[in-house]
């Protein structure tokens, strides 16, 4: 074994330090996907900061994510979207189209927009602790949610429907769904389905 060479993949016009996982992995993925590609992992020594415009006094690190390490949405938000889609004669979609890390239950549709922090009970028994996510920026949506990840088929129905009710003045009218968040406390803790959480609501 040995250390693979460091490479700098480019994604969405950004560069990030990464470790190439070698020729064997590259060949497997190239054969499977039918096009030349490399498998890389982030360089743990490379620290990339999320925008201080949104994180304020918190130095929040991210790696290959678009701009922030965590995306939070809710079951009620995707249910609300699906009700609108079905009412227009379209099929319901899964929340995976929006690629969230955390999906909240027990809140109203788009309450994640009105929450500035989530405290999640992590650990078990005497080791119980709390992880804190700070919601910092609405997530402006590109056309990717229009694509069915199971079939790669694309339809404008999702974007067209979101555009009727999800224009966000905080981002100059951009269409948003979900909130970008950063880890304020509890980095390295494990999140699991069903963990209890508390939220701080804020209203402008």
Where on the chain are the PLM-derived regions?
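Metal-cofactor-dependent catalytic cores
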Residues: 1-204
